[in-house]
Amino acid sequence: MSIFKGSGVAIVTPFCENGVNFKKLEELIEWHIENSTDAIVICGTTGEASTMTEAEIKETIKFTVDKVQGRIPVIAGTGSNNTRKAIELSKWAKSIGVDGLLLITPYYNKTTQKGIVEHFKAINDDVDVPIILYNVPGRTGLNILPKTLVKICDTCSNVVAIKEASGDLSQIIEMKALLKDRIDIYSGNDDQIIPILSIGGIGVISVLANIMPKEVHDMCELYLKGKTKKALEIQLNTLSLTNSLFIETNPIPVKTAMNIMGIDVGELRLPLCNMDESNLNLLKKELSNHALIK
């Protein structure tokens, strides 16, 4: 059974002077539920987990689970390039009631394809909770190859899905051909939602949903219900805005956009920094063109 179908928001973490702005996070959670977001993915890349302390990560995940109260699935980013650390955080996340885990490939260490399998198997064997793998070689320097994914699925009963952000549609098609319905595929790129749905994907883990939650949900729902032309229209109509959210490293533009829109999510944490002025002007133009600001 799928953890979710449709739009899972890779939600930003709002910060304030004292740390995480939990009042704002609660507002965001309620806003997403009201606007039909299908799942919340907390403490991922867009949530700046890499600049948060372990205590902040745990408090943020628990707060989210407590506030959502089972209304939609909560998926926690508990991956690491330290297998033991990933196991410990994943065990803890299970204990407080998350619906799934998002596990990034082990970055920086430069392990082999065999090492990728063994890393995920170690987590799988110690933590009985649904797992979404996160393949984003542009960030990690490590690509889960299709045949490697087959080996993972053969040995890891809790691995139920993959967030595919390689951008390589040929690779994703090969994954689907090899595994059929043994694993769910989520788009990890907002500009490839429709292409990935068209080859059997079931949704997206989305950055765009932070500012257009209803539109991303509708795009997925329409496609999955067979209304493919209307779904494609949303993809095409939001494409220029989507592209503007990636003119600098995510989540710099999306967090900047939210602040411009009056959704005060606070500052970015170093080493992420404020946008270049020319890129900022382009972002503002796209927000205006899509009626998100006046």
Swiss-Prot record:
Ligand binding (pyruvate): T46, I205
EC number(s) reported in the record: 4.3.3.7
The protein's annotated pathway: Amino-acid biosynthesis; L-lysine biosynthesis via DAP pathway; (S)-tetrahydrodipicolinate from L-aspartate: step 3/4
Locations listed in the record: Cytoplasm
Catalytic reaction equation(s): L-aspartate 4-semialdehyde + pyruvate = (2S,4S)-4-hydroxy-2,3,4,5-tetrahydrodipicolinate + H2O + H(+)
Location of the active site: Y134 (proton donor/acceptor), K163 (schiff-base intermediate with substrate)
GO biological process: diaminopimelate biosynthetic process; lysine biosynthetic process via diaminopimelate
Protein purpose: Catalyzes the condensation of (S)-aspartate-beta-semialdehyde [(S)-ASA] and pyruvate to 4-hydroxy-tetrahydrodipicolinate (HTPA).
Listed NCBIfam families: dapA
Protein name as it appears in the record: 4-hydroxy-tetrahydrodipicolinate synthase
Lineage of producing organism: Bacteria, Bacillati, Bacillota, Clostridia, Eubacteriales
Name of encoding gene: dapA
